[in-house]
């Protein structure tokens, strides 16, 4: 074993989900597959009200729109936020196929969404992305953003890691 391997922190452990959370996270993962099929990065998001009403769904549309902010989470929030009040969103859950980036975590904070469930974590995503500078992220956890929030944002993940990882295989430049 190399010295580097012994200094790396362990990958986050998978979190078990109940039937409802699993169903909606799988819906977000299916949207990630659609995003990839359309030439985008493979990410999907679903926002669900406390009563189970679907408020919004979206996939990453960077590739097809050229909009660097067209991440799945921000796109879903752009649909849900004007149509539903802050109280509804505070009780809602955003399901994301991947751990939200710092931009998306900020949008989740500003939208008042109170709960996030995500699939593949940022550490595992970085392994798919490789070392190319044009594919790097800010390396700031969404939990860091959520922990700085004056209102609570529950964060559950990583979950369904193998399912959430599948659409990333071969999707990133070597």
Task: Put a short name on every predicted segment.
Residues 1-35, 107-174:
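Zinc-dependent deaminase
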Residues 62-74, 79:
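A short, polar/charged loop-to-alpha-helix boundary motif
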Residues 86-99:
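Immediate flanking context of iron-sulfur cluster ligation sites
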């Amino acid at each position: 074993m190399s010295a580097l391997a012994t200094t790396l922190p362990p990958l986050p452990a998978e979190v078990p989900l109940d039937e409802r959370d699993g169903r909606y996270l799988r819906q977000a993962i299916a949207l990630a597959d659609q995003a990839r099929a359309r030439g985008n990065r493979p990410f999907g998001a679903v926002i669900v009200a406390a009563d189970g009403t679907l408020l919004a769904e979206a996939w990453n549309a960077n590739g097809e729109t050229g909009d660097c902010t067209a991440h799945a989470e921000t796109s879903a929030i752009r649909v849900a936020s004007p149509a539903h009040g802050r109280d509804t969103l505070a009780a809602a859950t955003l399901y994301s196929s991947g751990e939200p980036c710092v931009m998306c975590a900020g949008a989740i904070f500003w939208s008042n969404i109170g709960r996030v469930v995500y699939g593949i974590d940022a550490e595992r995503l970085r392994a798919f992305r490789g070392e190319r500078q044009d594919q790097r992220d800010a390396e700031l956890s969404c939990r860091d953003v959520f922990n700085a929030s004056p209102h609570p944002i529950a964060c559950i993940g990583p979950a369904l890691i193998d399912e959430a990882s599948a659409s990333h295989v071969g999707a990133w430049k070597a």
